[in-house]
């Protein structure tokens, strides 16, 4: 059964990608950003430190929302067992790969908490040549929408997908499906390894529930001020979208 999108305040719609190697660096970033960020994504680099769940617990104790981005992909029983245990933690979002219907169904059935499962469709760093190298001679957007519909049918709560595809996903899946967009670039796309990017306002206009931002905050001279500026963009976009 699909869970509806999280009831997020505007301030909770900015997710900072906490791409750091360990606990101390993670907490230093949380302290540095203070009240400007209320939602954090923790991924594979932190997992390799052995301190992943210490960070998750520390974030929860600071009343921060947590997005576990580990892109689970295995046989259905293994993924189901992982989701069953992870759903007992204070986690808002969790990613699973969106390429195996049986695995998606098992993950959805195993989710026993309020956590929303997001299917990974096509990574934002990938373009058509990358898909062609995998034997898929199609445009990324076509694959993304197809995978989003398959995930929805399997009981998954939403997708993590490029803002370029958010509008098409929203039209295909309807309002009761979560869309989280990574690779967001304030002011519009720039040249880096995220190929399919959009700006903040465009992502929300096209139906995103939340956005993930990493480098534009992390590399800023004043990260907290950069996050606050993005929060202002989000508030304006959310108000405009509601109107």
Curated annotation (Swiss-Prot):
NCBIfam families: PRK00230.1, pyrF
Name of the featured protein: Orotidine 5'-phosphate decarboxylase
GO molecular function, a single term: orotidine-5'-phosphate decarboxylase activity
Reactions listed under catalytic activity: orotidine 5'-phosphate + H(+) = UMP + CO2
Entry's Gene Ontology BP terms: 'de novo' pyrimidine nucleobase biosynthetic process; 'de novo' UMP biosynthetic process
Family according to the record: Belongs to the OMP decarboxylase family. Type 1 subfamily.
Main function: Catalyzes the decarboxylation of orotidine 5'-monophosphate (OMP) to uridine 5'-monophosphate (UMP).
First-level EC class: lyase
Active-site positions on this chain: 71 (proton donor)
Pathway in which this enzyme or protein is active: Pyrimidine metabolism; UMP biosynthesis via de novo pathway; UMP from orotate: step 2/2
Highest taxon of source: Bacteria
Record's keyword terms, sorted: Decarboxylase, Lyase, Pyrimidine biosynthesis
UniProt source species: Xanthomonas campestris pv. campestris (strain ATCC 33913 / DSM 3586 / NCPPB 528 / LMG 568 / P 25)
């Amino acid at each position: 059964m699909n869970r509806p999108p999280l009831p997020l305040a505007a301030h909770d719609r900015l997710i900072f990608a906490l791409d750091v190697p360990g606990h101390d660096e993670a907490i230093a970033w949380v302290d540095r950003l203070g009240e400007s960020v209320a939602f954090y994504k923790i991924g594979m680099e932190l997992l390799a430190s052995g301190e992943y769940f210490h960070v998750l617990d520390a974030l929860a104790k600071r009343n921060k929302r947590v997005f576990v981005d580990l892109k689970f992909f295995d046989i259905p029983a293994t993924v189901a067992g992982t989701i069953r245990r992870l759903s007992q933690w204070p986690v808002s979002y969790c990613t699973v790969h969106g390429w195996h219907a049986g695995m998606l169904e098992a993950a959805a059935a195993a989710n026993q908490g309020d956590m929303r499962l997001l299917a990974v469709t096509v990574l934002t760093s990938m373009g058509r040549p990358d898909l062609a190298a995998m034997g898929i001679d199609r445009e990324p957007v076509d694959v993304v929408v197809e995978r989003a519909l398959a995930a929805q049918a399997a009981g998954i709560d939403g997708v993590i997908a490029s803002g370029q595809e958010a509008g098409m996903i929203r039209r295909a899946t309807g309002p009761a499906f979560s869309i989280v967009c990574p690779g967001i670039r304030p002011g519009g796309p720039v040249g880096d390894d995220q190929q399919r990017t959009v700006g903040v306002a465009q992502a929300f206009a096209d139906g995103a529930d939340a956005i993930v931002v990493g480098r534009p905050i992390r590399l800023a001279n004043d990260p907290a001020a950069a996050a606050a500026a993005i929060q202002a963009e989000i508030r304006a976009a959310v108000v405009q979208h509601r109107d």
